[in-house]
């Protein structure tokens, strides 16, 4: 049972600056139970509840509304899936100068697809409206859970582990949230954390002066001291501070820096004046203190957090991949039987040691699947060229399979793609968001003969133009040396048994 404190969790009222930031960033600011309100349709001024949007979504009750948008519960009539649809008035956001802001938020959500981040499903538009279709998270805000009392240490640790996993992923994609707080952490029906509201987020490409943020934004009680100085700050370090505040609240049931007078509260933040409750274990107190270090240069980093003894207890790296523009999660019950690995050309949630271990495992992988006659028939022409066909390509190689894997990892490192390996299948995941999300490519190796393999390349996510450009400019030039051009050997394989040819 959660222990209920005598005083409820209190958040200070917004300052004028915070009010404006909230106005710009949080399109949904007011919850409501009104079910009579309805979204506007591209075909009529009003669409009643129960109407069908874009021949795909049945509109349900109003969940919330703000100055520029309304959010509705809806149901995908084809899959039966519940979703949340944000309906934005184009004219209002254009007049207010927020069109670029909306585009940036959509772009960021496409970039940071992760099991612990609210999923952007699709974006639709008409002449007057923008429809942002999001995952519907049933459990509500984590704030409401903590407001009833501080959490058990194991529960708080699990929420914190999921938060750090998602933040680490965002940072690896060059995205800094800048408004992490309990109200922006939702819980799904399985009790997992979902980070939401990327309205104040910034991407590394936007930053000036060697990656320094200049904008004063965020929620007062969660602001890092360097943000208050208005002299510029690193988004990653500011996010870590906010995570430290969240961890403190999860375990204490109240804010570390709190005062009715906001100037007094800012002074406490700037000086780092807080005290851990007596029920904090020494390990937890040390972790919180490292995260709430007022000096950003000595503040603990994400990799250090993930190596901390308190954090590591019971922690499992979440495993997932993007396929056909959908996020797919790999659930393994046994960490010791881990059949997939991760490496990257950029920073990621896996440590350098993990990456080295995974690369060394390649030599002990199981034998790749062999092609039978029907497989060969379906491949049709194995002439050794990089045969392209729509969203897939293949070639024959006589190179060792470990060499092919290494070359793919080398290419990924050059273009800063993430690499996920499982047996003789390699998944390359880009970080640049396209119209259909980041480019994701799967490369599979099949045994053709004891000395020949077929390497098959398929697009699993992203748009076709980006895929073709990547194949033509990156994959093909670097893999050509591994291609096998001895047609007679391939033709010999293609001589199928008479019963198959018939």
UniProtKB/Swiss-Prot annotation:
Catalytic activity, as annotated: L-seryl-[protein] + ATP = O-phospho-L-seryl-[protein] + ADP + H(+); L-threonyl-[protein] + ATP = O-phospho-L-threonyl-[protein] + ADP + H(+)
Q: What is its EC number?
A: 2.7.11.1
Chain residue ranges for the region called Disordered: 32-51, 331-359
Q: Which residues form the active site?
A: 179 (proton acceptor)
The record's top EC class is: transferase
- Low complexity bias locations: 35-48, 340-352
Q: Which cofactors does it use? A: Mn(2+)
Q: Please, one GO biological process term? A: signal transduction
Tell me which PROSITE patterns the record gives: NAF, PROTEIN_KINASE_ATP, PROTEIN_KINASE_DOM, PROTEIN_KINASE_ST
Where is each Protein kinase domain found?
Answer: 57-311
List, alphabetically, the SMART domains matched.
S_TKc
Span list, region PPI: 390-419
Which sequence positions carry the modification called Phosphoserine?
201
In this UniProt entry, the residues modified to Phosphothreonine are 215
**Self-association or partners: how does it assemble?**
Interacts with CBL2 and CBL3.
**Primary role:** CIPK serine-threonine protein kinases interact with CBL proteins. Binding of a CBL protein to the regulatory NAF domain of CIPK protein lead to the activation of the kinase in a calcium-dependent manner.
| UniProt record similarity statement | Belongs to the protein kinase superfamily. CAMK Ser/Thr protein kinase family. SNF1 subfamily.
Q: What is known of its domains?
A: The activation loop within the kinase domain is the target of phosphorylation/activation by upstream protein kinases. The PPI motif mediates the interaction with the ABI (abscisic acid-insensitive) phosphatases.
Protein name according to UniProt: CBL-interacting serine/threonine-protein kinase 13
- In its UniProt entry, the species of origin is given as Arabidopsis thaliana
